[in-house]
């Protein structure tokens, strides 16, 4: 990608009114003889995504460290997210509350070492090729930054206490009783900044809320932008939402008001770890070109340091879900949206969605997940060395990495805009 191309793709977007005017004025000279196609509202909305705004939102989230659930830094991050959503014009914010019980602390399991062969991965996947060890860092001293050690020092309290998700809703003009849910999880672990897992997904959802909340933007159907808590403890925030809200779908309240506190779910779209697709782990070499060995004499494996040229956005559904057929159609609709509107990276569709906040929804509504790699087959095989580690820092990622996240945002924005009948009024 040339510097000129990068600049063109990441330059600050123009206001909606200017874009609409330019779209309409361009063909005026031919207006008397040639029919004028109306401007494409989806293209206009996708054009409002901006790399620097996306990066700035991720950076803002990192001020709260790893945002571990149950801590003051997690609650402060929720407050910050809600304030941002309101500042965008998505002012009808709400909190969904639930109780979570933190078990007594136990000695963490050792990271899984890679094994030969092709064993089963999570979500029905199969593991192939070289694999690096994975695990969750629980050692404060593994974080060399004293400031981050202090910021992340408060542990989750044991016992049962209150947790919250936060969300806001773009209310549809024609069908407010129906909605698509667009989500990401805002909590993290590992003693880092949780910049990628899942600051990258949280920032994506917030950017979509910003754009859909702009004056003049209308959708026929509603869109709910949700930031889940307690993903890292077992998808508890998303599960609480499903448990509390699934039986309220499509109910008008009060009767005759035209208001639907929980519109009927048409689809759930999750975003988790959006930026790092450097490829399969490879043997690391010393200065003499010899393989590096660990303390057990095994080769040290790690993914390449640069984003690979063939990086893509992975769109997953779960083949065993009750709504698998609808989820597959939704996934392929998003793939088509990527083909038409994304700027740098393509998308691929897989059917092993697992271990993410769309999973509690998948037997209630078509549900898909967008991410940097397949969750079971690739992330679970050590393709991301920063996963749950103290190195999940804003500074660990390049613009090529951030751009992959932005392309996922382009994909979801375009797909949701098409499905909800988005319009941009002059």
Where do the protein language model's features map onto the residues?
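Metal-dependent peptidase/peptidase-like ectodomains
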Residues: 228-357, 363-367, 374
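Second-shell loop/turn segments in exported
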Residues: 40-49, 62-73, 152-157, 187-199, ...
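Bacterial N-terminal signal peptides
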Residues: 15-27
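Alpha-helical metal-binding/catalytic segments enriched in His/Glu/Asp
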Residues: 166-168, 182-236, 412
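Bacterial N-terminal signal peptides that target proteins for export
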Residues: 2-18
């Amino acid at each position: 990608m040339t510097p000129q191309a990068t600049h063109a793709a990441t330059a600050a977007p123009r206001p909606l009114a200017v874009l609409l005017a330019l779209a309409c004025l361009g063909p005026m000279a031919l207006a008397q003889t040639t029919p004028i196609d109306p401007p494409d509202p989806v293209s206009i909305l996708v054009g409002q995504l901006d790399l620097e705004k996306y990066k700035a939102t991720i950076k803002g989230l990192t001020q709260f460290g790893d945002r571990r659930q149950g801590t003051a830094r997690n609650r402060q991050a929720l407050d910050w997210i809600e304030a941002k959503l309101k500042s965008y014009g998505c002012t009808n914010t709400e909190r969904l509350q639930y109780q979570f019980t933190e078990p007594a602390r136990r000695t963490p399991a050792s990271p899984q070492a890679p094994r030969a062969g092709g064993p089963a991965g999570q979500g029905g996947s199969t593991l192939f090729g070289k694999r690096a060890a994975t695990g969750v860092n629980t050692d404060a001293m593994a974080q060399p930054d004293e400031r981050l050690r202090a910021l992340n020092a408060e542990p989750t309290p044991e016992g049962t206490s209150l947790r919250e998700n936060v969300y806001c809703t773009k209310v549809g003009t024609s069908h407010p009783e129906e909605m698509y849910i667009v989500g990401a999880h805002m909590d993290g672990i590992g003693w880092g900044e949780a910049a990628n897992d899942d600051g990258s997904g949280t920032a994506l959802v917030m950017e979509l809320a910003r754009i859909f909340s702009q004056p003049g933007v209308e959708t026929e159907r509603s869109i709910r932008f949700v930031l889940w808590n307690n993903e890292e403890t077992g998808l508890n925030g998303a599960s609480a939402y499903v448990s509390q809200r699934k039986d309220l779908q499509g109910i008008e309240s009060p009767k005759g008001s035209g208001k639907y506190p929980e519109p009927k779910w048409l689809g759930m779209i999750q975003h988790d770890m959006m930026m790092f697709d450097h490829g399969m782990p490879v043997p690391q070499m010393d200065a003499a070109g010899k393989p590096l060995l660990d303390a057990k004499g095994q080769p040290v494996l790690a993914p390449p340091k640069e984003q690979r040229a063939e990086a893509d956005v992975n769109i997953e559904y779960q083949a065993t879900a009750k709504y698998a057929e609808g989820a597959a159609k939704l996934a392929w609709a998003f793939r088509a949206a990527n083909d038409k509107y994304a700027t740098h990276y393509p998308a691929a569709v897989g059917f092993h969605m697992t271990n993410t906040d769309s999973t509690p929804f998948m037997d209630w509504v078509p549900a898909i997940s967008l991410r940097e790699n397949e969750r079971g087959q690739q992330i679970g095989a050590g393709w991301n060395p920063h996963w749950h580690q103290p190195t999940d820092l804003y500074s660990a990622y390049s613009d090529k990495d951030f751009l992959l996240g932005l392309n996922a945002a382009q994909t979801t924005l375009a797909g949701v805009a098409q499905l909800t009948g988005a319009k941009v009024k002059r």
